[in-house]
A protein has these predicted regions:
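Charged, solvent-exposed interaction patches on well-folded alpha/beta domains
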Residues: 1-46, 52, 64-366
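Generic alpha-helical secondary structure signal
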Residues: 54, 58-62
């Protein structure tokens, strides 16, 4: 085959492909202009054995209540973006995709978030994912995850939905802006302080010279010196008082800034404890024995602001005072050794509390 013929055939092939693409696109546009939605298929792509937070029936209800038309609607008129936004408004929905197939079926694919734990603490009723995303527990949800109860106060309001890290960063940014605003309040005070310092320096340079050209006598000169001394003493008192007032105001503002910085540290510590709690729940869930043994996790915020945990085990009638979420593996190892060498021989109903908060100690109370 000659080179010319080969190039000609190749060109015709590409022309045919381009023509097919144009024809197919035209056909799709024609179908979208004239076709209607005949079916609605909703799929929750990651339903698991734990249960579900969202169902096809719930999605149908949302779409119906929102007044978004689907079945019998022209394909081009279906508000796909509106459907996606409507579904995504629910915090327990991670991702959603809506599209209409060539055959006129409206497909809605939904990926739900995977909660790690449910918080039922201090007026809170929310699910939390392993990365700290929080969302309200939906009605009629049936998801089996560990539950944390108690008086623990998480670092976000009960109505919050979203990434807790983003919430913390927003709060920290607001505090930073408040600190900067307070710093700007100091600027006029700094200028007044510098002006006052210049006045004090000028006061020190004030002198009286004898006016020889006027043949000034000693008595007149002494009188002028006394008057200057009195004037300087009065100005000195004024400038010192003014310096004290300015410095006091600067220190007051600095105190407010320090209080804001303490808020930041407290907020960061609260977030750190929050993530430690999630890691703790993961540790329990990842261990076959403790996942079965730990029936309930009770968390509380101490007067100092620290997070402490108490466990209700399946075995016995006692509570395990776990304390702060530090050295978690060491504490669990210590508790397991006590289970095997202590309670197995003493009895599982002998104690009311088992305290493992202290290093190398297990303190039991009847």
């Amino acid at each position: 085959m000659s080179r010319y013929l080969r190039y000609t055939l190749l060109t015709l092939l590409w022309v045919a492909v381009a023509a097919y693409i144009v024809f197919a696109a035209s056909a799709v546009r024609r179908v979208r202009r004239t076709g209607t939605v005949g079916r609605l298929e909703i799929e929750v792509v990651d339903s698991s054995s734990q249960g579900h937070l969202v169902s096809a029936a719930m999605v149908r209800q949302w779409i119906s209540h929102a007044g978004i038309k689907t079945l019998g609607t022209a394909v081009d008129a279906v508000d796909l973006t509106g459907i996606e936004r409507l579904i995504a408004r629910n915090g327990f929905v991670d991702k959603t995709v809506a599209y209409v197939s060539y055959g006129g079926t409206l497909h809605i694919e939904i990926s739900q978030r995977k909660p790690l734990v449910r918080l039922l603490t201090d007026g809170m009723n929310a699910y939390v994912t392993a990365d700290g995303y929080v969302f309200a527990a939906p009605r009629a949800s049936s998801l089996y995850v560990p539950v944390v109860t108690g008086s623990y106060r998480p670092p976000f309001p009960a109505s919050y939905v979203g990434s807790v890290r983003e919430h913390i960063d927003l709060r920290l940014g607001e505090i930073d802006e408040r600190i900067a605003e307070l710093e700007r309040e100091k600027y006029p005070l700094y200028r007044r302080e510098m002006e006052n310092d210049r006045n004090i320096s000028a006061l020190r340079r004030m002198r009286i010279k004898r006016q020889w050209w006027r043949l000034e006598g000693s008595r007149e000169f002494d009188a002028r010196v006394d008057a200057l001394r009195e004037k300087k003493a009065g100005l000195r008192r004024t400038y010192r008082y003014r310096a004290g007032v300015i410095r006091e105001e600067i220190e007051r503002i600095a105190g407010l800034q320090e209080a804001e910085r303490r808020k930041q540290k407290k907020l960061e510590k609260s977030y750190e404890d929050y993530m430690k709690l999630l890691t703790f729940v993961e540790t329990v869930e990842d261990d076959d024995f403790w996942r079965s043994e730990v029936v309930q996790i009770t968390a509380k915020t101490t007067p100092s602001g620290a997070l402490e945990v108490e466990l209700t085990p399946r075995s016995g009638r006692f509570a395990v005072l776990f304390g702060r979420l530090e050295d978690v593996e060491r504490k669990f190892d210590k508790l397991l050794r006590f289970y095997r060498s202590g309670l197995s021989s003493i009895g599982w109903s002998e104690y009311r509390t088992i305290d493992i908060r202290y290093n190398d100690q297990v303190v039991c109370k009847k």
